[in-house]
Amino acid sequence: MNSFFHEAVEENPIIAAVKNMDDLKICCSLEDIRVVFILFGDVCSIREIVQQIKDSGKVAMVHVDLISGLSSKEIVVDFIRKNTEADGIISTKAALIKRGKELKMFTVLRYFLLDSMAYENIRQQQHAVKPDYIEVLPGVMPKVIGKVCKMS
């Protein structure tokens, strides 16, 4: 698989997360942003949102859990693959990450690390679905994030 997503993250680890059209417009105009996480939209608008990002030369990652009108089943990943030019998906659901990998999309497993049980769940899911990246939230946990980095 092409490694441009990994290269983009390595070159500039600051990733823009857009939640509305105003954020999208600003993000697309910034040259130093290479990867964009799409955290909004609906089944009718996601194609155009992704296209704006792609037209600005950036990597487009769709958070499929946050797109209105789409289900939480694996078919949502097929929909994104078939109907947009998205480079990959973000999800909190391991089954969707697994489907994204099957479709040769880049994947980010988003995880809320709230306690030791959640930490163990990350270990299990990471081994089962092998996402390209794991996004740990909340992002104010440097020691725990360091541990997650070492295990992956």
Protein language model features and the residues they cover:
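Short alpha-helix boundary/capping motifs
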Residues: 55-56, 108-109, 128
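Structural recognition of alpha->loop->beta junctions
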Residues: 78-90, 124-135
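Histidine-centered beta-alpha loop that forms part of the nucleotide-sugar donor binding/catalytic region
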Residues: 65, 112
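Short, acidic/polar
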Residues: 17-29, 73-79, 117-127
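Conserved beta-strand positions in the central sheet of alpha/beta enzyme cores
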Residues: 15, 35-37, 61, 81, ...
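Active-site-adjacent beta->alpha loops and helix N-cap segments on the catalytic face
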Residues: 2, 40-56, 69-74, 91-105, ...
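Conserved N-terminal beta1-alpha1 strand-loop-helix module at the mouth
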Residues: 1-62, 68-70, 85-86
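Structural motif
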Residues: 30-31, 83-84, 103, 128-129, ...
